[in-house]
Amino acid sequence: MTFEELNQKWIEDQVTDGNPLQRSTFNRHRDAILNIVGLIIECDQANGYKYYIANPEVLEDDSIERWLFSTLTVSTILSESVAVKDRIILENVPAGEYYLPVLIQAMKLNRRIVMGYQRFDGEPYEKTVEPYSLRLCKQRWYLLVFTGHHIATYALDRMLSVEMTDETFEMPEDFSPEAYFAEYYGVLTDETPMAHVVVRAYGRTSNYLRTLPLHPSQREVTSTEDYTDFCFDIRPTADFIGELLSYDVGLEVLQPADLRERIKRLLDQSLKHYS
C-alpha cells in the first residue's frame, strides 16, 4: 500500500475528522508499532514505493506480538464504535491486570518483587520472588516465578500488593516459559505423567476442536459422519480434565484407560448431587 493509499484510509476514518496524514505522523506511528508490537514496516521503492510488513512471522499463533496486535486492533475498532457500544458485550477480566505494569517492569529489569498474596482458602502472606513469565489463561493472568526453591505459579487476581525491589536476579539462559508449559493444558503443572490421550468428539464438538485446538499436540485421527477422534500427547492434569468435562456429552475419553476411569468416577460423583 502506498503512502497516498494510506492517507486516503486515514482521511476516511471518523477519528481523524477528515484531516490528512502527515508524513511525520506516519513515521511516529510506524516507530510506535515497531516498539510495541515488533512489526517492521518498510518501503519497497522498486514496487511503486509501497509499504509492507517485513517480518510477518512475528504474528504467528500464540506469540505475544500476535496477542498485542489483536488487542490493539480490537481496541481501535471499539473506540470507533461508540454508536453501538451498548450492543458489544465483553468478558470481565479480574482486577489482577492492575499489577501488570509493575510486573512487566520487574521482568524487564530482572528485579525481585515483594508480593502480598492470599489463596482462596488461606491467610494473607508476603513473599519475595523472581518474576519469570506472565501467562493469560481463561481471562485470568498468572505469574510464573522462582521462589528461591522451586518454580511456582500465582494468580494476579489473588495478589494483594506488588512492590519491585532493588534486588536483581539472573534468569537461567536455558529456561523457556513456553517449554515449561508445553506438556500441559492451562496453568496447573505437577508430576502427572505424560500420556497419549485419545478422545471422541460428537456432533458440533468436532468443529469446535478443529477451529480451536486444545493443545499444540492435538491431531485428528479418524473422522466419520457421527464423530471424530483426536489425540494429544499431554500431561492430563486437573485443568485438562476440567476442560474435557466442559464439553458435556459431546466428548468421550477413549484412552488411556485410567483417565477414562477417572472421568467416569468424576461423573458418578457429580450425579450424586442430583440424586
Regions found by a protein language model. Name each.
Residues 41, 134, 162, 220-221:
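A structural signal for short hydrophobic beta-strand segments in well-ordered beta-sheet cores
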Residues 2-17:
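DNA-recognition alpha helix
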